[in-house]
């Protein structure tokens, strides 16, 4: 499979096609009084991520058609990305995994210190596969081989979901508690996703939690020793049940895109979605959803994961989504017959669930401030207060 980088030839060809389609899109929306803002601000993960590369593929096309200045900002720290998007409102759209949105709403780890803010799904970005990777010459051949003392595990500290994946969910899959993992493994902390990946090929860690679709993964694949993926067999129901207790928004799957070494390996799918907030102009969200659907054939080849932005992928996401959808997107989906009464039912239920989490989380912060309790995820007094406020609220779970 070709390397997941935006090629200049593809981009040029896409812009040529765009010249013939932009007038049609504008004419379809003639008579609408909506005026695009001077700038559409979009946040993505690091520059070495497929999310950043693919967004830079379709962004210039949207700009050429609508006249809006599309600004794409990479932010590798997921907590900083959340704060800038939700609290500071620096962005209108953000590409983030469903796992991370779950953590940010439920106040896991570093998110517990941040104000809780409602988020809404706009469009499916990609169904990102994830798994655990070792160097090609590693002595570890199966995921169960990790169940021994002395294993060095990369710990990507900028991402709470990735930390949970390696410190808690991976041990659970192989039949350990997080305490047993802490007692037997050596965690190698790193501050960025790229560092997390390179620990394996550089020999600093034995195993890392990695997606096969990023440009950095293709660099790993090109290493003289290559890389190898430790399968998470779909037949291991005990392992998966334990894993999903800790990562309830992921989906067991078989990897079918990314680096060649990942093909056919049983692993995880954690969808990346373009998200917005309810306070963002929903007319603009409606037009974005319309553009994503109607212009799919024009932008689908700008990057390998852009093909995962089809209406079919969006509809499949909706069939399992744990999170509410933006009003503007719902309006468009209703127009094209892709939204049902059943969708309204589950969506309203998820809005109500998110409202419970947001209210409880923010009430905990308010009480902590009033009592001068230090708001920090390592302060047990604050965490106990937070648990008191959120006790009994169900977590967000993928609808199977």
Q: How should each PLM-predicted stretch be described?
A:
Residues 1-4:
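Positively charged n-region of N-terminal signal peptides that target proteins for export
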Residues 9-21:
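Bacterial N-terminal signal peptides
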Residues 24-26:
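Boundary at the C-terminal end of the N-terminal hydrophobic targeting segment
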Residues 37-65, 69-71, 129-202, 213, ...:
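Bilobed "Venus flytrap"/periplasmic-binding protein-like clamshell domains
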Residues 38, 212-225, 229, 287, ...:
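An extracytoplasmic/periplasmic, membrane-proximal ligand-sensing/linker region
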Residues 54-61, 71-115, 194-199, 213-223:
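Pocket-flanking alpha-helical
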Residues 98-100, 108-109, 120, 138-139, ...:
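Pocket-lining segment of extracytoplasmic ligand-binding domains
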Residues 148-169, 249-312, 321:
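Ligand-binding clefts/hinges and TM-proximal coupling segments of bilobed small-molecule sensing domains
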């Amino acid at each position: 499979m070709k390397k997941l980088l935006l090629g200049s030839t593809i981009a040029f060809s896409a812009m040529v096609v765009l010249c013939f389609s932009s007038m049609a899109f504008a004419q379809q929306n003639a008579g609408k009084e909506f005026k695009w803002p001077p700038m559409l601000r979009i946040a993505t993960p690091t520059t070495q991520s497929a999310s950043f590369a693919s967004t830079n593929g379709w962004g210039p096309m949207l700009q050429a058609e609508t006249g809006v200045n599309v600004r794409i900002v990479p932010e590798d720290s997921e907590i900083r990305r959340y704060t800038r998007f939700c609290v500071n409102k620096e962005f209108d759209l953000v590409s983030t995994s469903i796992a991370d949105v779950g953590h940010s709403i439920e106040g896991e780890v570093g998110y517990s210190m941040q104000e809780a803010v409602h988020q809404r799904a706009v469009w499916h970005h990609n169904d990102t596969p994830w798994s655990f990777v070792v160097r090609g010459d590693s002595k570890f051949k199966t995921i169960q081989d990790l169940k021994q003392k002395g294993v060095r595990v990369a710990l990507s500290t900028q991402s709470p979901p990735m930390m949970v994946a390696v410190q808690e969910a991976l041990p659970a899959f192989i039949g350990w508690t997080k305490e047993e993992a802490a007692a037997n493994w050596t965690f190698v902390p790193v501050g960025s996703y790229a560092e997390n990946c390179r620990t394996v090929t550089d020999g600093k860690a034995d195993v890392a939690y990695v997606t096969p679709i990023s440009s950095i993964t293709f660099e790993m694949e090109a290493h003289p020793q290559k890389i190898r993926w430790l399968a998470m067999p779909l037949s291991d129901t005990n392992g998966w049940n334990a894993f999903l207790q800790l990562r309830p928004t992921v989906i067991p799957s078989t990897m079918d895109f990314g680096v060649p070494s990942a093909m056919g390996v049983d692993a995880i799918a954690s969808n990346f979605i373009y998200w917005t907030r309810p306070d963002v102009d929903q007319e603009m969200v409606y037009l974005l959803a319309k553009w994503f659907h109607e212009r799919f054939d024009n932008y689908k080849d700008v990057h390998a994961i852009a093909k995962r932005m089809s209406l079919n992928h969006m509809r499949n996401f909706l069939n399992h989504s744990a999170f509410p959808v933006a009003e503007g997107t719902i309006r468009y989906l209703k127009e094209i017959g892709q939204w049902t009464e059943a969708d309204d039912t589950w969506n309203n239920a998820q809005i109500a669930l998110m409202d419970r989490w947001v209210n409880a989380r923010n009430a905990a912060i308010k009480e902590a401030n009033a009592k001068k309790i230090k708001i920090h995820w390592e302060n047990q007094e604050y965490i106990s207060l937070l648990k008191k406020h959120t006790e009994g609220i169900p977590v967000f779970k993928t609808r199977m």
